[in-house]
Every structure is written in C-alpha cells, then in structure tokens.
Swiss-Prot record:
This is Arylalkylamine N-acetyltransferase 1. The record marks 99 as: Might be involved in substrate binding. Changing residue 99 to A: Reduces catalytic activity. It comes from Drosophila melanogaster. Its EC number is 2.3.1.87. In the adult, expressed in the midgut portion of the thoracic segments and the frontal half of the abdomen (at protein level). Expressed in the epithelial cell layer facing the lumen of the gut (at protein level). In the brain, expressed in a sub-populations of neurons and astrocytes, and in a set of distinct stripes in the optic lobes (at protein level). Expressed mainly in serotonergic neurons but also in subsets of glutamatergic, GABAergic and cholinergic neurons (at protein level). Catalyzes N-acetylation of tryptamine, tyramine, dopamine, serotonin and octopamine. In astrocytes, regulates sleep homeostasis by limiting the accumulation of serotonin and dopamine in the brain upon sleep deprivation. Is not essential for sclerotization. It is found in: Cytoplasm; Nucleus. The keyword Nucleus applies.
Length: 275
C-alpha cells in the first residue's frame, strides 16, 4: 500500500469543516452517525461524563506533528477495545503505534478538534495503489518483533493473500483505505464520525478516487460501516484461519471474523463476484 503522488495537498490541508457539535442538520451522514454513535460504542459503555452539546469543533487534516496526540487518544479509546488486541491481551506495543501512524504521510487522515485544541476523534486513512503484475507483496509480519502483534499482522497478510480489492474494481488504480475510526467516548453521539467520514469523501472527490475500502475485525465497526452505506466484499471467519492447523483468534462474541467493506463514492464499476 504505497502512496501515489496526488495534486497539491496545500489546498486540502487548509480546508476545515467548521461546525457546531449540536448542528447535525449540516450533513445527512452526520445525522446518521449521531444515531449510530448513540447506539454503538467500542466498549459498549456510556460516556464517562457529559459534554457541552454546543461545543465547536473542526475537522482538520492530521499533521505529522500530531502523531503523539493521535497515539495518546488511540491508547485511551481504541487499542484496548479492539477485539484482536483484547483477545491477545496485547498491552503496550510500540510496533502497533508505529503501524497506526504509517498512513499519515498520505495526507488523507482527519481529526476532530475541540475548542481547547484537543483531538476528540480521528479517521486514519491510507492510499492503496493497484500492484503491478510482477510485484512481490511485502509481508508486514516478517519485520515485526513483537510476538503478539506479529500474529495480528500475519492475519492481515493472510487476508491480503486471499483477497484483492482491485479484483473487485478492475478499472480502479487508486483506492482510499480506511484504517482506524475512533471517537472520544465523552463526545460520542454528536455526529463526529459522520463528519470525519464526509471529509474523507470530499478528499476522494477532490482527487478522483472512487472506492473506499475498510477492513473490520470488529462486528460493531462493520455494522457502523453498513449504516454509512458500505457493503461487504469479503468475509473470513476467525475459526477458518488456521495457519498451523489450529485456530489463532477466538475473540468474544459477537466478533466472529474479518469483513472487508467497500463503498463506491464515485463512478466505480464492480466486477461480478461471489462471497
């Protein structure tokens, strides 16, 4: 998943969607995700404390210098609740932190920032380029020294071996890959995930990218993506992943497998496939 040189990012980076948390009539997708965020949280627990419903926040491009703040947020609101991390009791993992920030140079990841300058939501995205026929796929797990995280990367490598999104969309050369969508639990229910996703759609339209790809290891994440108009293009049960003859991942219900979701934001034409 390498970066293709795209049009000047300076214009993109200067654009902000200035909005008030309570004014969810600006975007239909924000109204939808407000309902979804009310119903679903990663942990399933309510927000720890109430927040000001009228607090202003902006949607901004994540900058390289935001890395530390992004990781701090993910440690609090994402890493500990991700099903595979939880099952393996992953704990502190510098390799995971580095891996999470890897797509930032693609200049298509966005953050929600409150009036105090705090990051209250992120959508980390990367760019996927169609591989050349003679390309040898790199295995992310080969260079990982953390034994538990290596298991997760090995699973991701296996999924890439079994499924190629470019086979589904034979006319596409570049696809946006949604990596991590996370919202501060104290600000859920305010449509932030919808605003982050809408900004990603705008990026796609600005750069002629037609397809949005998201890999979900969480049942809840897959349901949210469905509500956002994504559809399933690949599925693999955790019970079917047996690299050494034994099942590696047995996360708690309802997390039963990997789902790859896709959405056509532009005029993409999908090939006829069977799940």
């Amino acid at each position: 998943m390498e970066v293709q040189k795209l049009p000047d990012q300076s214009l993109i980076s200067s654009m902000m969607l200035d909005s008030r948390c309570g004014l969810n009539d600006l975007y239909p997708i924000a109204r939808l995700t407000q309902k979804m965020e009310d119903a679903l949280t990663v942990s399933g627990k309510p927000a720890a404390c109430p927040v000001d419903q009228d607090c202003p926040y902006t949607i901004e491009l994540i900058q390289p210098e935001d890395g530390e703040a992004v990781i701090a947020m993910l440690k609090t609101f994402f890493f500990k609740d991700e099903p595979l991390n939880t099952f393996l009791d992953l704990g502190e993992c510098k390799e995971l932190e580095k891996y999470s920030l890897k797509p930032l140079p693609d200049n298509c990841s966005y953050k929600a920032v409150n009036k105090k300058g705090e990051i209250i939501g992120v959508f980390l995205n990367g760019l996927m380029r169609r591989p050349s026929p003679d390309d040898v796929p790199e295995k992310a797990a080969d260079s990982c020294e953390h034994p538990k995280f290596k298991k997760i990367l090995s699973l991701m490598d296996h999924v890439e071996e079994q499924f190629n999104i470019f086979d589904v969309y034979p006319d596409e050369e570049l696809i946006l890959d949604g990596k991590i969508l996370s919202v501060d639990t104290n600000y859920r229910g305010l449509g932030i995930a919808g605003r982050l996703t809408e900004r990603a759609y705008e990026y796609m339209r600005e750069n002629g990218i037609n397809v949005y790809h998201v890999l979900c290891s969480s049942h809840y994440s897959a349901r949210v993506m469905e509500k956002l108009g994504f559809h399933e293009v690949f599925r693999m049960q955790f019970a079917d992943y047996k690299p050494q003859g034994e099942v590696v991942f047995k996360p708690a219900a309802p997390h039963v497998g990997i789902q790859v979701m896709a959405k056509e934001v532009g005029p993409a034409k999908a090939a006829q496939t069977k799940l």
